[in-house]
């Protein structure tokens, strides 16, 4: 073995010598030939990273135009949470004697916004890990012991997405809307940034904001700075630039008709494995919040003011074979084929190589679109970072699924035609037998039938899963009724049976909480929405970081908690595939003049 493995103890004669040596070793590249020096360097570096996130966070408040007011100090307790698919919340409690209490309670109008930011690492502040939000409620509280406090309730800046409407045609005023619905087929990140940019332009871009609010002059106050509004980097709310040529996210169809963008984007982003994150950027930050615009130079890509930047991020873990926008439609085909074929033909648990209880992607693996294995893995052991984990195995709740209440329309029409035709022939026979003159009551005899027998034939549909019958045994739950569309023996009825079959299936779900820094550090090795793995028993389960929560108070140190997965039942893959196909069908309808679109 090469290298000198002896240990140098010359500086260990005094405590000061030890400290000087440790400081010198953490600031310079270690001598890899000395294992103790290399170990101390790596250990000190790891500990420094952990300690950096144990500092008291930097809390600041800002005015309605996001201009600095003051640092918030002397807090009694702080709880902030950022959520992947919704608006996170925060609560800060300060003493009533705090000098900011009077300002927050009395020295401002209730309509005036106050912004709040929290930097988890005050010595290395960055827009990428900053929590930014709006104070929505200020409570003056007196408890039973006579202690007066002020409680600040905040909501994360992602809440803005719930208050931006997606216009049917954002380039025209609401009084003139043609076509009746906005449709955009594109890769998810690009499509999301386009629809949000257009609807922000309605608010901040003077050449668009004034014409689209021609009958609403009050909105003109939002573009007081006409010259500055021409620059999207000067808007208070911005969209992170996405290079459409290298956007590999899954192709989707976005449609809106004056719904809020949170609702418009929720299902397409879930299907594409993307998330919408709201960053709070300050002019003090070293880097631009538009990294894909960096080819122009960081100076040209920097916003000109403090702002909120919405970013569409692909967290699916999938990278396509071409590395370009072509991967989007190819991935759509592969995933839809897996949803429609693999999850229907392959019985649950038959193709599950990793043992996590979910059918592995088969067609996606063939075409090169299977998600990559996560780099961050939390394992069980004596020093594990897993706080608690729960594996739930839910049994099947029905052998038979039933749906319906109405017969197919064509069957009711055929039945009506047959009965009315028979009655009309009966009327002719009566007239012939009783004489060649009109008999009272015979004309219009067929009009006696007014659909009394509609929805009596093939109005109900059932499906019994033979595999469940054998596995559940004699005492298994028997039946489940799925409401659905209510028409049996149609494509809608078949989908209703499938939905009911999915809801009553046996499945395995997981939920876990992770302690930060053991060994992975949030916002250093991974961030919100990233796919990480955690060990439960002998199986590694993969899920996304759905929430990051930071809390501390006067008696407890800073605690960072991570939530993996969501408390939502996994969606039926066939329903996802049908929603995708329906989107393309509706898009075709717009070109052929469908009444629902034009």
Where are these regions (language model features)?
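An acidic/polar, Gly/Ser/Thr-rich interaction patch typically located in mid-to-C-terminal regions
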Residues: 74-108, 254, 263, 321-598
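Generic detector of short, locally flexible boundary/turn motifs and exposed helical patches
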Residues: 22-25, 52-59, 114-118, 241-243, ...
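Short, conserved helix/loop micro-motifs enriched in His/Cys and acidic residues
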Residues: 231-252
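Broad, structure-driven detector of short, well-ordered beta-strand segments within folded domains
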Residues: 274-281, 401
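A generic structural signal for ordered alpha-helices
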Residues: 70, 182, 239, 246-247, ...
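Beta-rich nucleic-acid/ligand-interaction surfaces
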Residues: 283-298
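Glycine-rich, flexible loop motifs
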Residues: 221, 226-235
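Assembly/oligomerization scaffold segments
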Residues: 2-225, 252-258, 262-272, 278, ...
């Amino acid at each position: 073995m090469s290298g000198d493995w002896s240990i140098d103890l010359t500086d260990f004669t005094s405590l000061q010598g030890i400290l000087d040596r440790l400081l010198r070793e953490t600031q310079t590249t270690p001598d890899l030939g000395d294992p103790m020096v290399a170990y101390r360097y790596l250990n000190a570096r790891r500990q420094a990273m952990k300690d950096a996130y144990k500092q008291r966070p930097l809390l600041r408040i800002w005015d309605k135009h996001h201009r600095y007011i003051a640092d918030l100090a002397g807090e009694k307790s702080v709880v902030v949470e950022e959520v992947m698919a919704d608006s996170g919340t925060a609560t800060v409690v300060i003493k009533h004697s705090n000098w900011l209490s009077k300002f927050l309670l009395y020295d401002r109008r209730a309509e005036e916004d106050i912004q709040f930011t929290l930097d988890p690492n005050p010595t290395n502040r960055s827009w990428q890990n900053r929590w930014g939000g709006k104070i929505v409620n200020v409570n003056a509280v007196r408890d039973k012991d006579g202690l007066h406090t002020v409680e600040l309730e905040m909501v994360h800046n992602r809440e803005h997405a719930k208050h931006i409407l997606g216009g049917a045609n954002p380039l025209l005023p609401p009084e003139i809307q043609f076509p009746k619905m906005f449709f955009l087929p594109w890769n998810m990140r690009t499509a999301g940034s386009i629809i949000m940019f257009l609807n922000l332009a309605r608010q901040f871009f003077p050449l668009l904001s004034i014409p689209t609010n021609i009958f609403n002059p009050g909105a003109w106050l939002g573009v007081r700075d006409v010259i500055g509004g021409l620059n999207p980097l000067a808007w208070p709310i911005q969209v992170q630039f996405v290079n459409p040529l290298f956007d590999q996210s899954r192709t989707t169809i976005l449609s809106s008709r004056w719904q809020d963008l949170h609702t418009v984007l929720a299902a397409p982003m879930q299907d594409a494995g993307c998330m919408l994150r709201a960053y709070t950027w300050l002019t003090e930050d070293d880097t631009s919040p538009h990294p894909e615009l960096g080819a122009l130079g960081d100076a040209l890509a920097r916003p000109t003011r403090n702002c909120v930047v919405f970013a569409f991020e692909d967290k699916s873990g999938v990278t396509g074979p071409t590395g370009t926008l072509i991967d989007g439609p190819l991935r759509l085909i592969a995933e839809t084929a897996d949803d429609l074929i693999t999850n229907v033909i392959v019985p649950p648990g038959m193709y599950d190589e990793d043992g996590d209880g979910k059918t592995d992607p088969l067609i996606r693996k063939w075409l090169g679109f299977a998600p990559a294995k996560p780099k961050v893995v939390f394992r069980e052991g004596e020093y594990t970072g897993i706080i608690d984990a729960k594996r739930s195995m839910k049994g099947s709740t029905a052998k038979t699924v039933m749906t319906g209440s109405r017969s197919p329309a064509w069957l009711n029409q055929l039945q009506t035609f047959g009965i009315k035709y028979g009655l009309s022939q009966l009327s002719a026979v009566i007239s012939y037998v009783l004489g060649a003159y009109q008999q009272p009551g015979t004309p219009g005899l067929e009009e006696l039938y007014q659909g009394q027998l509609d929805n009596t034939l093939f109005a109900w549909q059932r499906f019994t899963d033979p595999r469940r019958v054998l596995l559940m045994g004699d005492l298994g739950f028997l039946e489940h009724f799925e409401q659905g569309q209510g028409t049996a023996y149609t494509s809608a009825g078949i989908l209703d049976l499938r939905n009911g079959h999915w809801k009553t299936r046996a499945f395995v779900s997981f939920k876990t909480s992770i302690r930060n820094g053991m060994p992975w550090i949030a916002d250093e090795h991974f961030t919100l929405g990233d796919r990480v793995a955690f060990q439960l028993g002998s199986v590694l389960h993969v899920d996304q970081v759905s929430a990051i929560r930071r809390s501390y108070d006067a008696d407890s140190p800073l605690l960072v908690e991570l939530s993996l997965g969501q408390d939502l039942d996994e969606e039926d893959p066939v329903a996802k595939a049908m929603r995708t196909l329906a989107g393309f069908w509706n898009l075709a309808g717009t070109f052929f003049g469908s009444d629902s679109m034009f």
